[in-house]
Amino acid sequence: MNAGPSWNKVQHSKNSSGKRQSKSQVPHASSQPRSSLTAVTQPTEEKLKESISPEARRKRNPLGSRCQGASGNKLFLDFQSMKIIKENADEDSASDLSDSERIPIPPSPLTPPDLNLRAEEIDPVYFDLHPGQGHTKPEYYYPNFLPSPFSSWDLRDMALLLNAENKTEAVPRVGGLLGKYIDRLIQLEWLQVQTVQCEKAKGGKARPPTAPGTSGALKSPGRSKLIASALSKPLPHQEGASKSGPSRKKAFHHEEIHPSHYAFETSPRPIDVLGGTRFCSQRQTLEMRTEEKKKKSSKSTKLQRWDLSGSGSSSKVETSGHIRVPKQAAVILDSADSCKASKTQAHAHPRKKGKAESCGHATVSSEKKLKTNGVKQNTYKLK
């Protein structure tokens, strides 16, 4: 309703004088909104007052008077409080009253509860500032809550008699609810005795010294013992290397004495040797190569010896008796063991498989040659 006449004026100016006049009159119309608003609101208020009948006014008067009285009181209180706040905003009041006490505030509907508390009994001994001058400060005491015949009983001694010494007859019994109450107090006394003993045992225990190599952050003694034992023991790889060393030396001496018999004799613990370091494996390959070279040289020398012994006289053969026959059996057994060992080594080291197979073929050929030599010797005996 308020914007109606202003828009009508703008439209009329557009129709009469064109676009330029409308642009010039728009700010003029917007500069006078208050006059148009007042002109519109005055006749509307008069019309509303005339439309309301006098009977309705009579009905609304008593309710309106009450509301006006309540709202008037609230407004008066609010005005008074705001006045006091404005007066004391810049100046600090010297009174001890708070703002809620100085400013009148309507009472709240919630009333505080009435607490009927008994007065505290204050013992002047506990507030004595100089206890050393006069009488000594006594220990704090609790009032006796048990009746007169039972208040003199020592519940701690009764708990020790029942649980530690198992003397149930020495402890008096009481029936009813009071007896159950006393039994429960005795149980609590026994629990207190147990806790005191446990705490004393914990404090008396000395901490075990940790290993020098380990850090001091280890808390449990079991861990420190395990680590100390692990440090004292050597590693399994070191054990295998230390044990395989003398066994290799022994095998090497045997190969020097009987090179064809112990061509591929391994150490008693091949798993430890295989689990060793790379240095041990390289050393083993070098030893294998030297053994192969020695084996080839020993084959040629041994064949020459067998030929010389075969061309010898029959008397020498008969006097010798067994002509290295048991040694031939030992050769067969040792060669079989060496083949097994070579197979295990070939499975463990697939890269060295070709070398192991070639060595195995060489031992088989040496066995055949030895067998043929043995047959020649047997035929020589029969002749």
UniProtKB/Swiss-Prot annotation:
Transmembrane segments: none
Bias (Basic and acidic residues): 44-56
InterPro entries, A to Z: FAM217
Cellular component per GO, a single term: cytosol
Compositionally biased region (Polar residues): 8-43, 374-383
Disordered as annotated region, ranges: 1-70, 89-115, 200-222, 232-251, 284-325, 338-383
Designated name of the protein: Protein FAM217B
Annotated organism of origin: Homo sapiens (Human)
